[in-house]
Amino acid sequence: PTQQNPIHISCSCLMDASKTPIFWMLTITFFICGLSSTGIVGQHFIPFCSDNNVGAVVAASYLALMGIFNFLGTLGSGWLSDRFNNYNLLAIYYGLRGLSLIWLPYSDFDVFSLTLWAIFFGLDFIATVPPTVRLAGNFFGPIKGPIVFGWIFASHQFGSAVAAFAAGETRDSVLTYLPAFVVAGASCFIAVMLIIPFRKHKPVTA
């Protein structure tokens, strides 16, 4: 395989993976991951805070705090992914993320609530990546797994783009970010429902 055209290898892996339910589950949930993280929070958290009388510099500080706990959360998620059921972890991560996104618009946007949110959401921000990578490796093998994850990651970026655009359009139309954040949070619960049927799914490739 190393002597083949890399584009052919990549497309061949995609064709094979697209015939499996696990690929579509991971692809759709990772689309939701991008939508509910970098797409809406990465692009719209600061202007959302500005709409609630929180200065841009202060809001950016909360975003930086979120980044610190994102680092810790990702490390912790990697450790957990080596030891526990990755489906359960993903379901928990998406569920908690959904709750935090829905809670934010109804918070007071004061120091306590924004600090609490930044820590909580930060721990969950990239936590979905380690179990997603591990599941891709488990099901598609050490050679195809990374390539398949590359395609799955493309859906993450597409989800980010959709949320970045749609949340901005919604804000301009209804003059509030509340619907966008609630919809993003609700989408996380869709991810949970997609994951649950796979909890006892076994790898089909070595």
What are these regions (language model features)?
Residues R83-Y94:
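Cytoplasmic membrane-interface "Motif A"-like loop-to-helix N-cap segments
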Residues A56-V57, P142-I152:
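Loop-to-transmembrane helix entry/capping segments in MFS-fold secondary transporters
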Residues A184-A206:
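Multi-pass alpha-helical transporter architecture, strongest
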Residues M15-S77, A163:
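Extracytoplasmic gate region of multi-pass secondary transporters
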Residues A127-F140:
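Intracellular juxtamembrane helix-capping segments at the cytosolic ends
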Residues F31-I32, S113-A127:
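Hydrophobic core of transmembrane alpha-helices in multi-pass small-molecule transporters
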Residues C49-S50, L80-S81, A166-L175:
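Interfacial helix-cap and linker-helix signal at transmembrane-aqueous boundaries
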